[in-house]
């Protein structure tokens, strides 16, 4: 049978009576309230003050101010103003107010797309396109768009002119329309804009030239000249509903160098005719 050994008495440790009292109180949950509340209150006030200081610092330094986008824009402004496009990264970090690591993030990206090259550890040189005309690119694009709009407008006007020329050709040279190429007195009288005005109708051959000199105070002079045949001038009395040939009150006509050959189609030299109209107020 085994014999039980008597329990060995451990040597007692020398403890400070004050420390033993504090430890006993900490282990006892009932005595937790015995801790000094003043110490807890001081710690809470310190924490609140620390948090408020951190918030104040965040307000003073917006996140956008240190973003890569903002720093890259400022970096490009420095590149644009740098002589030869060479920058000292130490000075760049000082001017931007950031660590050099942030500047290296920018230069590494630009170096990867062959826009800068490293001259030394802390110096880079811009090797991209010329930045002196960087601001003129939007203006150049705007001018190109305006030029495209003007070219499109010019093409549209050319089409309208071509269409009008075709309609004029069909009106004057078409055999079906040739017999209807005239206006009657009733047609002129029905136009409201001609009322209370002097209306002069001119019947002249092709390529007839009409010149209107500067009007005088009391009259207007009109020169009509033709080398292909006679010129007939009619005055339409719109108000009275009558027409008169060559003469009317306040209107004078004179004819010179005008002949009526018996066979104009057999004549070698074309017939010349000139009319001078003078309308008095």
From Swiss-Prot:
One of its GO terms (cellular component) is chromatin. The keyword ATP-binding does not apply. It is found in: Nucleus. GO terms for molecular function: DNA-binding transcription factor activity, RNA polymerase II-specific; DNA-binding transcription repressor activity, RNA polymerase II-specific; protein dimerization activity; RNA polymerase II cis-regulatory region sequence-specific DNA binding. Expressed in all tissues examined. Highest levels in placenta, skeletal muscle, heart, ovary, kidney, small intestine and spleen. A motif (DEF box) lies at residues 95-129. Its main location: nucleus. The keyword Ubl conjugation applies. GO terms for biological process: negative regulation of transcription by RNA polymerase II; regulation of transcription by RNA polymerase II. Residues 143-164 are annotated as: Leucine-zipper. SUPFAM superfamilies: E2F-DP heterodimerization region, Winged helix' DNA-binding domain. Gene3D superfamilies: 6.10.250.540, Winged helix-like DNA-binding domain superfamily/Winged helix DNA-binding domain. Residues 50-129 bind DNA. There is a cross-link at residue 9 (Glycyl lysine isopeptide (Lys-Gly) (interchain with G-Cter in SUMO2)). Keywords: Cell cycle, DNA-binding, Isopeptide bond, Nucleus, Repressor, Transcription, Transcription regulation, Ubl conjugation. Residues 130-222 are annotated as: Dimerization. Residues 241-281 are annotated as: Disordered. Residues 173-281 are annotated as: Transcription repression. Forms heterodimers with DP family members TFDP1 or TFDP2. Component of the DRTF1/E2F transcription factor complex. Part of the E2F6.com-1 complex in G0 phase composed of E2F6, MGA, MAX, TFDP1, CBX3, BAT8, EUHMTASE1, RING1, RNF2, MBLR, L3MBTL2 and YAF2. Component of some MLL1/MLL complex, at least composed of the core components KMT2A/MLL1, ASH2L, HCFC1/HCF1, WDR5 and RBBP5, as well as the facultative components BACC1, CHD8, E2F6, HSP70, INO80C, KANSL1, LAS1L, MAX, MCRS1, MGA, KAT8/MOF, PELP1, PHF20, PRP31, RING2, RUVB1/TIP49A, RUVB2/TIP49B, SENP3, TAF1, TAF4, TAF6, TAF7, TAF9 and TEX10. Belongs to the E2F/DP family. Inhibitor of E2F-dependent transcription. Binds DNA cooperatively with DP proteins through the E2 recognition site, 5'-TTTC[CG]CGC-3'. Has a preference for the 5'-TTTCCCGC-3' E2F recognition site. E2F6 lacks the transcriptional activation and pocket protein binding domains. Appears to regulate a subset of E2F-dependent genes whose products are required for entry into the cell cycle but not for normal cell cycle progression. Represses expression of some meiosis-specific genes, including SLC25A31/ANT4. This is Transcription factor E2F6.
């Amino acid at each position: 049978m085994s014999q039980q050994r008597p329990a060995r008495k451990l040597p007692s440790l020398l403890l400070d009576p004050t420390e033993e009292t504090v430890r006993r109180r900490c282990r006892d949950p009932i005595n937790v309230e015995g801790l000094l509340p003043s110490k807890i209150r001081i710690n809470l006030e310190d924490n609140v003050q620390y948090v408020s200081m951190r918030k104040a610092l965040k307000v003073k330094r917006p996140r956008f101010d240190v973003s890569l986008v903002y720093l890259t824009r400022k970096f490009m402004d420095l590149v644009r103003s740098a002589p030869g496009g060479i920058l000292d990264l130490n000075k760049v970090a000082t001017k931007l107010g950031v660590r050099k690591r942030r500047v290296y993030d920018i230069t590494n990206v630009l170096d990867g797309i062959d826009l800068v090259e490293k001259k030394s550890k802390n110096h880079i040189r811009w090797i991209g396109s010329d930045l002196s005309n960087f601001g003129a690119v939007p203006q150049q694009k705007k001018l190109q768009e305006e030029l495209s709009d003007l070219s499109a407008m010019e093409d549209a006007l050319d089409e309208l002119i071509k269409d009008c020329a075709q309609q004029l050709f069909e009106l004057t040279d078409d055999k079906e329309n040739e017999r209807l190429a005239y206006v009657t007195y009733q047609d002129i009288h029905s136009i409201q804009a001609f009322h209370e005005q002097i209306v002069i109708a001119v019947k002249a051959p092709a390529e007839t030239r009409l010149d209107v000199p500067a009007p005088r105070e009391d009259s207007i002079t009109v020169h009509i000249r033709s080398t292909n045949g006679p010129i007939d001038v009619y005055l339409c009395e719109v108000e009275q509903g009558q027409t008169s040939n060559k003469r009317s009150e306040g209107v004078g006509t004179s004819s010179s160098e005008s002949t009526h050959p018996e066979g104009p189609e057999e004549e070698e030299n074309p017939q010349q005719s000139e009319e001078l109209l003078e309308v008095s107020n």
